[in-house]
Amino acid sequence: MKKYILSLDQGTTSSRAILFNKKGEIVHSAQKEFTQHFPKPGWVEHNAQEIWGSILAVIATCLSEADVKPEQIAGIGITNQRETAVVWDKTTGKPIYNAIVWQSRQTAEICDELKEKGYSEMVREKTGLLIDAYFSGTKVKWILDNVEGAREKAENGDLLFGTIDTWLVWKLSGGKAHVTDYSNASRTLMFNIHDLQWDDELLDMLTVPKSMLPEVRPSSEVYGETIDYHFFGQNVPIAGVAGDQQAALFGQACFGEGMAKNTYGTGCFMLMNTGEKAVASEHGLLTTIAWGIDGKVNYALEGSIFVAGSAIQWLRDGMRMFKDASESEVYASRVESTDGVYVVPAFVGLGTPYWDSEVRGAMFGVTRGTTKEHFIRATLESLAYQIKDVLCAMEADSGIELKTLRVDGGAVKNNFLMKFQSDILDVPVERPVINETTALGAAYLAGLAVGYWKNQDEIKEQWHMDKRFEPTMEAETSEELYAGWKKAIEATKAFK
């Protein structure tokens, strides 16, 4: 009987189930979008029950359409939108509030208070993160402080917290496994990335009871099995978990120190593997856990850019400049340059290395001769400039010079953007054959745990390149363009 690995990719806007075979190829996939809730400006929430429903739906669709029986699944890997926080009742299994999404700014005031109390240095040292509404810790505190009776229930040990991976493992296992992996734990603001434990000092700071927290385990091991009534009568090992960006790093086979990938999704996330050492950042990067496997923990430096693919969506839906995102490449290629136009897409502030949530988007250098084509090109170029900002910070922090950048995500189909990215970074950009690297990474982690794949060397052999973009731009030109971007950033920051 032919066996497969099932990868569950629970993202910000949709849930997907993807079946992989022994060669790391996609056999079939199914996708289902779910509702985004915006109760107040800057707030973003999801219904965790709806997410769970979407996962059950895509599993059923994927298996039936592929004509694969549940007993043919050797293991399940889970990858997830990170930082998004769910708090649920241990007994009823029902969330006590919507999941607060990573993008949501509703805990910004809590963060300001913590900074004023002087916690920043301690948080940075222990977690590798900044005090920011982006991470899970303040979201949990907000739920406990704002949902009636929640704090009392939490103190009594009646509530459980989890990032989305934890929620899904708990549901799939019928409430038997309350676990997370190192990569997801490292994004909560409550986990010490050096001694690999939930940290009492951080929990006191956030007033979160320890009894709510999941057990932290490696990213590749069997956490439990599916309870039969959630998996067509089968007990399948749930065997791999990693946050989406770390899973993509693993799926891109960036196993060596200094290897890096950039994912172009809603936002952009660039991670560089720093091996078994946690490199502290002096340049606004995050130090995070890449994965834990074979008794070892790998660390990474991460740069987070809040607006990437969503800038292209904005051109399409908000500005109505084209009907399909793929047209952006056509328009951008019609002009030789932006004619000095810069777009800074700070719609929800700026991430790495600026970390300024107050700034908003801006546009510079506009003349009467500026056209739609210039505007679209400038928006695409802004994605590449933001990655350059991140790379400069990474090289400064790690002392490692990047040799090539592996890329994935929706926008990598845009050849104009990939070529410009290579030019502005002055390094080759490699696009893989399988772009679903996030789901692939989770599949690999699960497959290794159940012996479906032997080791990381076998996985490395499966990475194949679709196209390599080489830099051809004169250094002087790219430096000039980047200097203009830096000026645009300064001007944007001045306007608040």
UniProtKB/Swiss-Prot annotation:
Entry-linked Pfam families? FGGY_C, FGGY_N
Q: Which keywords appear in this protein's UniProt record, sorted alphabetically?
A: ATP-binding, Glycerol metabolism, Kinase, Nucleotide-binding, Phosphoprotein, Transferase
UniProt cross-references to InterPro entries, sorted A to Z: ATPase_NBD, Carb_kinase_FGGY, Carb_kinase_FGGY_CS, FGGY_C, FGGY_N, Glycerol_kin
GO cellular component: a single term: cytosol
Specify which residues bind glycerol according to the UniProt entry for this protein.
R82, E83, Y134, D244, Q245
Q: Where does ADP bind?
A: T12, R16, T266, G309, G410, N414
Positions bound to sn-glycerol 3-phosphate: T12, R82, E83, Y134, D244
One GO biological process term is: glycerol metabolic process
According to its UniProt record, how is this protein modified after translation?
The phosphoenolpyruvate-dependent sugar phosphotransferase system (PTS), including enzyme I, and histidine-containing protein (HPr) are required for the phosphorylation, which leads to the activation of the enzyme.
Official protein name in the record: Glycerol kinase
What's the gene? glpK
